[in-house]
């Protein structure tokens, strides 16, 4: 672990943003995902190179930092390798690989933004007509962020959590069953309802992370 774990309690959000400087997205790596048939037996490294063929290394992060970039977002699909018992337990090997990549950045004193990113189509469950299906989305979201926040609770402000990416808003109506193609979803939320649920999701995220303690 290359992060000191010491929080600067006096640092404001504006000051933190200035320290983060220019950012870069480590795209098409740990957020890569596919069907159960496509990814059966995958290791974390298999997922990481599923959409492109170059695993992230210390050299990767050193090179990024050499161009003056001081923060990196690590988009992550946490459903990869999770348990199938309905408890949404994230595989420990997957946690370890994410942490390894984080430490590549921390070795350069960089900042890391970690989120739930795409992660297949389960976000569309938030807009399903069936309330029981919507609850499944809430259960997964809470289980994921509880585990993520607990796992990384002792890192300093060099680790920043982001609730989600473009899955929020009208994407909450996505076709999570893959019953159709194209960009139109099958959810029943109105536009106003989509953004009300988005606000609710983000507040839930804050509440979950804060409740885990540590440096959160």
List PLM regions with ranges.
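N-terminal carbohydrate-binding accessory modules
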Residues: 1-71
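Short, well-ordered coil/turn segments that N-cap beta-strands
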Residues: 18-22, 68-70, 108-112, 153-159, ...
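Active-site-proximal beta-strand/loop segments in catalytic clefts of secreted hydrolases
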Residues: 24-29, 75-77, 115-119, 162-167
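Enriched - but not universal
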Residues: 27, 54, 81, 125-126, ...
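Surface-exposed, active-site-proximal loop segments in enzymatic domains
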Residues: 36-45, 78-96, 120-137, 172-187
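Pocket-edge positions in alpha/beta enzyme catalytic cores
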Residues: 48-53, 64, 90, 133, ...
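Aromatic-lined substrate-binding rim segments of carbohydrate-active enzymes
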Residues: 56-121, 140, 198-213
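Active-site region of glycoside hydrolase catalytic domains
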Residues: 135-216
């Amino acid at each position: 672990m290359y992060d000191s774990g010491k929080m600067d309690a006096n640092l404001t959000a504006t000051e933190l943003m200035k320290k983060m400087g220019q950012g870069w997205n480590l795209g098409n790596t740990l957020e890569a995902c596919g069907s159960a048939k496509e990814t059966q037996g995958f290791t974390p490294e298999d997922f990481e190179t599923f959409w492109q063929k170059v695993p992230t290394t210390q050299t990767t992060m050193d090179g990024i930092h050499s161009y003056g970039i001081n923060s990196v977002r690590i988009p992550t699909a946490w459903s990869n390798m999770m348990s199938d018992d309905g408890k949404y337990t994230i595989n420990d090997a997957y946690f370890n690989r994410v942490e390894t990549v984080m430490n590549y950045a921390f070795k350069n004193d960089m900042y890391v933004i970690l989120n739930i990113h795409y992660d297949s189509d389960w976000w569309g469950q938030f807009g399903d007509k069936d309330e029981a299906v919507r609850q499944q989305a809430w259960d997964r979201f809470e289980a994921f962020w509880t585990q993520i926040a607990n796992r990384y609770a002792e890192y300093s402000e060099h680790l920043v959590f982001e609730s989600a990416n473009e899955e929020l808003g009208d994407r909450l109506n996505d076709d999570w069953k893959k019953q159709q193609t194209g960009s139109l979803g099958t959810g029943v939320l109105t536009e106003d309802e989509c953004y009300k649920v988005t606000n609710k999701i983000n507040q839930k995220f804050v509440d979950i992370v804060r409740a885990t303690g540590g440096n959160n």
